[in-house]
Amino acid sequence: MSREVLPNNVTPLHYDITLEPNFRAFTFEGSLKIDLQINDHSINSVQINYLEIDFHSARIEGVNAIEVNKNENQQKATLVFPNGTFENLGPSAKLEIIFSGILNDQMAGFYRAKYTDKVTGETKYMATTQMEATDARRAFPCFDEPNLKATFAVTLVSESFLTHLSNMDVRNETIKEGKKYTTFNTTPKMSTYLVAFIVADLRYVESNNFRIPVRVYSTPGDEKFGQFAANLAARTLRFFEDTFNIEYPLPKMDMVAVHEFSAGAMENWGLVTYRVIDLLLDIENSSLDRIQRVAEVIQHELAHQWFGNLVTMDWWEGLWLNEGFATWMSWYSCNKFQPEWKVWEQYVTDNLQRALNLDSLRSSHPIEVPVNNADEINQIFDAISYSKGSSLLRMISKWLGEETFIKGVSQYLNKFKYGNAKTGDLWDALADASGKDVCSVMNIWTKRVGFPVLSVKEHKNKITLTQHRYLSTGDVKEEEDTTIYPILLALKDSTGIDNTLVLNEKSATFELKNEEFFKINGDQSGIFITSYSDERWAKLSKQANLLSVEDRVGLVADAKALSASGYTSTTNFLNLISNWKNEDSFVVWEQIINSLSALKSTWVFEPEDILNALDKFTLDLVLNKLSELGWNIGEDDSFAIQRLKVTLFSAACTSGNEKMQSIAVEMFEEYANGNKQAIPALFKAVVFNTVARLGGENNYEKIFNIYQNPVSSEEKIIALRALGRFEDKELLERTLSYLLDGTVLNQDFYIPMQGIRVHKKGIERLWAWMQEHWDEIAKRLQPGSPVLGGVLTLGLTNFTSFEALEKISAFYSRKVTKGFDQTLAQALDTIRSKAQWVSRDREIVATYLREHEYDQ
């Protein structure tokens, strides 16, 4: 199958777009003038992208189209003109189109977002946009491909009291007969997916700490929560200018909180849009986690102003050049601004593990994956493009050195600014900066699916390393195991890390300086898993003092992954973490708890005595450290100590420790009775979840009331998620009903499922409910949207049996899965992996728990 692209007989140079939304009919009227370069004068038609657009007229240099042939499936319209029309044209011509469209509620194209006015209590709407990947064609007919860059001049028309925003600053604004007409200055050359415009009742705050205006817009009543974002954005823009040695080229930066938004944010050039929760911060009521999340999202989107906007991938298979870079740069800048957050340590337990988890599935895809149409393109906005892409950049930056890496990146941006680039162009720039053959080492990592597991065999003063493709199911076939990954070994011993060693073949032997202590993948910078002998695992578990935080996180994650896939026994993982009860790093503890939670969720349908024993194991692990630290947040507690306390407290509550649960209930009762200082912001999620887990209709009503009247957008989401934790049948049905009756916004459709998925009753009822309402769910949510992807993942991947796998497969075999077939395949692979793990190690885990007396 080949790319579904437009013919190259014309090339767009400039768009003049005028749009007027109608908030009563939920439609919009538009007119369009496109300056075209004529590449072939023998044609008599122009093909253009569109979706859900009505064409009222089309003409080129005064000659009317004689017909408009629309192909909704291909999302293309052919404008047919009289024979000879183009023969009489010069090298360029102006195409004019009058059209109208739907101001939809699908969070795509030019759409409406519903909200409640905080001042008046009225239900209102804002008209906003989400063009990436292929929805600019929903807003106006266009040549909707990333390498067909052009300039854009936008005019918006509406009632006079509404605010108009677009990528550029205002050129002129007039009021005629009660309507406002705003024309914006012409953009630089850019891709259609970055065009943005908003018509809404908005207020703003700004920062003057950058050479251009930096503003944060929100609906009335929320504007005061935008100052953190405005200040951070100004600082970040200045930092990126200095880092890349390239000025931000637009005359302003607007960031807007949008009430219904399918992703987290969108990097539209000069007009970045966000979910409310990912932009606005009530500092007094926000957790440290939320503050860090907002900072990362803002810095990710602002990095895109260079990576993606200034230099754009040539086609969507190069999406990682946008998303991988923006992800890496957000962590890089966060680390520069807030070193106490220890973000590069967190990276290993966050982004790297997210990448490995998805890439361990047979249904994963390469970083550079061939995509041909809109349905395929929308499905690659996943952990491969974002997390594996950024993990690859982290690996390269460690190999080349950060300073050299940034130098090469700056060269890449300068060479291709206002244009398009391919992955090879990046390798060339990094090679020029470093003098190393970057392409030969890195090319395979982007072109091939998966990653290796490295098996270590020890000899006298030597190790033999052998690589195979890693699959979480542990059943890699010979034909799937042909890739030889160039592995940067980063061999660590007591003298440091040797970054010169590379495994370029299936198997090779290396000298050891120190047999007593060594670790492959020092500081966990590589994208692979390491499998040691049981004896080496036992040694490493007692050598924590010789290992960095990243090393310890990596060992925990690797041990769990090797257990899940059958490379080692699950007891190996349990023994490792049992030796680390005195661990001081919150990052390592978070990985321990995450990995243990993965084990528990795989065992969720096992007998109660086994689940209780796993809870006792968890409590044995965490209670001593929790007792040593205490759970109260002190005024002098660092970011790291606060995170550690809440991680341990949460594990204790989740595993049934009655003392910690009673503390959580006390805090909640005080909070619900009006003492808003009763729960530290960082503890709010665990407190709400604990109360919900303990159940009761009275508590349900209290949490539901908090959901309807939250003190912050973060609290609203915490409450909504907690509603899913109630196991009572009637309360569970009530929560599910909110997803379809308008109580829960479509953007938050999956949030209650995050709570429902953690208990057996919820898992089974959620799947039954999804089957009952699938047609409505599929109609309500866009096929390729992150929201539907979340629903599938949360609704399906908690099953752990081959029987469930067969039933789910059979159900979807009768459904149209276009637009989410890849997500579905990944969900089924996840179930298969869990089923194999639990069937293989069921008795081994039971024996371990019995022998260590956790079954008492």
UniProtKB/Swiss-Prot annotation:
The processes (GO biological process) annotated in the record are: glycogen metabolic process; peptide catabolic process; proteolysis
Q: Which cofactor does it need?
A: Zn(2+)
Q: How is the cofactor bound?
A: Binds 1 zinc ion per subunit.
Please provide the record's keywords in A-Z order.
Answer: Aminopeptidase, Hydrolase, Metal-binding, Metalloprotease, Protease, Zinc
Give residues annotated as binding substrate.
132, 264-268
Q: Which EC class does it fall in?
A: hydrolase
Residue numbers marked as site, Transition state stabilizer:
386
GO terms (molecular function) for this protein are: aminopeptidase activity; metalloaminopeptidase activity; peptide binding; zinc ion binding
The cellular component terms of Gene Ontology attached to this UniProt record, alphabetical and capped at eight, are: cytoplasm; extracellular space; membrane; nucleus
Presence of the UniProt keyword rRNA processing in the record: no
- Catalytic residues, per the record, are 301 (proton acceptor)
Residues annotated as binding Zn(2+) are 300, 304, 323
Question: What EC number(s) would the UniProt record show?
Answer: 3.4.11.-
* PANTHER family assigned to the protein according to its UniProt record, in alphabetical order: PROTEASE M1 ZINC METALLOPROTEASE, PUROMYCIN-SENSITIVE AMINOPEPTIDASE-RELATED
Q: Which family does it belong to?
A: Belongs to the peptidase M1 family.
Q: Quote the function comment for this protein.
A: Positive effector of glycogen accumulation. May be involved in nutrient-sensing.
Miscellaneous comment: Present with 77000 molecules/cell in log phase SD medium.
Q: What is this protein called?
A: Alanine/arginine aminopeptidase
Species annotation: Saccharomyces cerevisiae (strain ATCC 204508 / S288c)
